[in-house]
Amino acid sequence: MNDAVELVWPNKDLSLRASGLTSYEWVQRTDCRLSKPLKVEGACDGLSARSNVLVVGDGLDALEALGATPVLGDGIRLVYIDPPFNTQKTFNQYGDSLARPMWLSMLRDRLDALRPHLREDASVWVHLDDSEVHRARAIMDEVFGESAFVASVVWQKRTSRESRSAFSSNHDTLLVYAPSGPRRWKASRNLLTKDEALLRNRDDDPRGPWADAPFTAPGYRKAQQYDIVTPSGEVLRPPRGRSWYATAKTFEDLLADDRIFFPRNGSGSPRIKLFAHQLRGLVPFTVWGAADVGTNDDAKRHLMELFPDTSVFDTPKPEELLERVIHIATNPHELVVDLFAGSGTTAAAAHKMRRRWVTVERNTQTVLDFTLPRLLKVVRGEDSGGITGQFSWTGGGSLEVLHVAPRFGALTGIHRSSAFMGSAGTLLSTARNEQRATG
């Protein structure tokens, strides 16, 4: 008996390919036009496994083009994508309305194309709101398997209240999948750093400030059931259903090393002192508050500082949010991929954190107005916002730009490969000349 549950939609058996600047076209997977070579402009021959790459084009075409270069050769450690939410609204920089079958195929096809390039310890994070997140989870179950699901992370994207709605929506959801499964991925993911600002030195310990934790452990262990006498003379036993954290011998050693703290003027239950180098990281919660990772408004203010004379995105993501995702899912120099670059937040955060990155944006005007100028500011050390201070970022590194024309439809004006590369080349050469002049 087959117990598989499947989401079905019109034209599911077809492939959805980019056509022209913003359209899509349904094609048979055997369509001979799919074997036609892609038109790629940029320094493909100069790309290496260490390159950071901004690709102008559709995500499917970009992955195919990069597959012929060394860029993806070591595998992708993190995919973070923030696709159009399909809210049926129009925003400053883009329209957000696709027929649902197209939206579903668009997401499915790009996840399918990413899968062969993922490392064994990779994770895929898809950022959505309530418009399509439930259907997206069904698609991700189909592409990666239900057993690959790790978590649904809820991000508090705003702190102001919307009084015109039945409910004031203040969250997005990040669906997290690990193709190797959550148990194996857990072994390689990073914990959150404990806030060392919370450490205190309440007894002037010469080893420095410390935190403390209960000197108890769950469960009954005979060797860890014994009397402890507090400095005030009280005799304590472990609480019901628990044991002391360690054996009596270990407790005596810790006590002699001044690693045991008795609160309430020496009459409280023992607690173990933990210094900064002994602190274990924190397992991430599935709810991320605005105070920890910022809001859309925080990100918007950052963009307005970078582009004071331009109408910026309505719902950009803060670098602090991406910093947490990238910290959990990667280590320095590993590859981060985003197929929906927008203003370039993912690549900007990855660059400041010294990760390699590939970011893809289909809209050439968005790239010229936001993505490329922002990333050049990061490289030149001219972006003081976001996570710059946290990582003491002062500039450095480099990036390459490719233009991948769609196989279907036509591009006109500035959107054509040669015209775009001319404008992008001007931005790049100006930035490099300025770097040489100030270096």
Label for each model-derived stretch:
Residues 100-153, 376:
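Conserved Class I SAM-dependent methyltransferase catalytic core
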Residues 74-90, 140, 336-350, 405:
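Conserved proline-anchored active-site loop of SAM-dependent methyltransferases
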Residues 66, 110-111, 254-283, 287-293, ...:
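Phosphate/ATP-binding catalytic cores across multiple sugar-kinase/actin-like superfamilies
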Residues 160-217, 407-422:
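Flexible, glycine-/basic-rich loop-and-beta segments that form/coincide
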Residues 358-439:
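PRPP-dependent phosphoribosyltransferase catalytic core
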Residues 4-9, 14-22, 100-104, 131-133, ...:
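Conserved S-adenosyl-L-methionine
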Residues 1-81, 85-109, 113, 121, ...:
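DnaQ-like (DEDDh/DEDDy) 3′-5′ exonuclease domain used for proofreading
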